[in-house]
């Protein structure tokens, strides 16, 4: 359940992470009516391999990890930090997920279900464009972190063989 204090904090959060200069405080607050507020405990699965994304997630607090492989042999391949979006790839391309998203710590997030996103597109198209920009920036952050990790691993492997 979202309290008024949560709502005010979320409006402030969105103002820090989305270009809200073209939106009023009331429009940002109205966006929250399309979202569900959730708290996911450490170690819980947010979205699993093989599922088709039916929601976008906005990580407010905490850290989530991206994992591949069966639960008996998991390999972490990335992290999502507060202020970033989760689940955008499967949500937009409607393909099954190839990574598991798990709460690395207790996380607070906003969930935007597909049916509410579709309504948001019609009622607030400007906000939808901002969400797409936000998705691109979140994917860019993930790609850059992952590229850096792969480069460091590659450098380490070459230093060990040389």
Regions found by a protein language model. Give the residues of each.
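Cytosolic regulatory regions built on CNB/CRP/Popeye-like sensor folds
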Residues: 1-162
């Amino acid at each position: 359940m979202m309290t008024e204090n949560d709502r005010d904090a979320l409006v402030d959060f969105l103002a820090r992470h989305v270009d809200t200069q073209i939106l009023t405080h009331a429009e940002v607050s109205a966006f929250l009516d399309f979202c569900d507020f959730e708290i996911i405990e450490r170690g819980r699965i947010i979205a699993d391999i093989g599922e088709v994304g039916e929601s976008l997630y906005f990580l407010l607090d905490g850290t989530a990890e991206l994992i591949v492989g069966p639960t008996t042999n998991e390999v972490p391949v990335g992290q999502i930090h507060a202020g970033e979006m989760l689940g955008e790839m499967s949500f937009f391309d409607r393909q099954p997920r190839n990574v598991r998203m798990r709460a690395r710590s207790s996380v607070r997030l906003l969930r935007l279900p597909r049916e509410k996103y579709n309504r948001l597109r019609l009622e607030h198209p400007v906000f939808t464009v901002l969400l797409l920009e936000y998705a691109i920036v979140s994917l860019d952050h993930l790609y850059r972190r992952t590229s850096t990790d792969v480069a460091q691993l590659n450098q380490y492997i070459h230093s060990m063989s040389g």
